[in-house]
Amino acid sequence: HGVPYMINTIGLGYNVAKVTEALGADAPLDSWDLLFKPEVVEKLASCGVSVLDSPSEVMGIALHYLGLDPNSESEEDLAKAEALMASIKPHIRYFHSSQYIDDLGNGEVCLSLGYSGDIFIASDNAAEGVEINYLIPKEGAATLFDFLAIPGDAPNPENALAFINYILEP
């Protein structure tokens, strides 16, 4: 058994001013095209683009963007996702699973593929006057659920239960 603790999504965080400046009024601010269209992400390379260092999640997103099963293990499907990632890689500043939290807020990058909670932290910590938005693309996004559970062989199940009860208090 488990108790739902937190919901997260994986989407795009972006610096509104820098992305608008780089792409103009026609920026696809509602779509994965912002990251996965080479001609779009190329224009953002100068202000910095980061991607999660989480191959299983990123490849699933790439597969979904291509209209394929995000859980596909087909060599043909994975080759298509690999080709998509290779097409944008020259425009990616780095792959990392936490550095973007600070970098998005302080202007080191203008677009990050990341976890919603991290991007909201970046927005909260952003320099004064810097607007960071979070985008769940119209094509859809991955949703993650964290659960609290007590293993059957936990050495202190009473303490674990007390902690879970504490966390669940409003």
Predicted features and spans:
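Short, well-ordered amphipathic alpha-helices
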Residues: L34-F36, I119-A122
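Solvent-exposed loop/turn segments at secondary-structure junctions
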Residues: I10, K18-T20, P55-V58, G117-F120, ...
